[in-house]
Amino acid sequence: MKIVVTSIFVQDQDMALEFYTEKLGFIKKEDVPMGKFRWITLVSPDDQDGTELLLEPNEHPAAKEYQKKIFSEGLPATMFGVADIQKEYNRLKEKGVTFTTEPTKMGEVTIAVFDDTCGNLIQIVQK
């Protein structure tokens, strides 16, 4: 068994698609109309056959509450791995991404956290 799709709640699918592709550099894999919303998945440019990230609308009240609560508590919604965190931090800062935590060594890993502008904090990690 393997993970093929994982999701992240977003406030606005179009805004999320723009942020995740133009700022972070992910590639749109699927964009299928499904009534009021769309099934939008993204993949890493380095692993286009790998795990897909679904931009899930947060329309359900439980999803909205969950997203608001973890954001207000400063908890990242998900984590992305990077080879060189300082290089990635600098690249994202140049693109206007707002970080809530600068690169910080924590034991064997270094982490940084940014705001995805769609209601989430995202952690990047270098192992």
Swiss-Prot record:
InterPro entries: Glyas_Bleomycin-R_OHBP_Dase, Glyas_Fos-R_dOase_dom, VOC. One of its GO terms (biological process) is L-methylmalonyl-CoA metabolic process. GO terms for molecular function: lyase activity; methylmalonyl-CoA epimerase activity. This is Uncharacterized protein YurT. Keywords: Lyase. It comes from the Bacteria. Residues 1-127 form the VOC domain. Signal peptide: none annotated. Belongs to the glyoxalase I family. It comes from Bacillus subtilis (strain 168). It holds the Pfam family Glyoxalase.
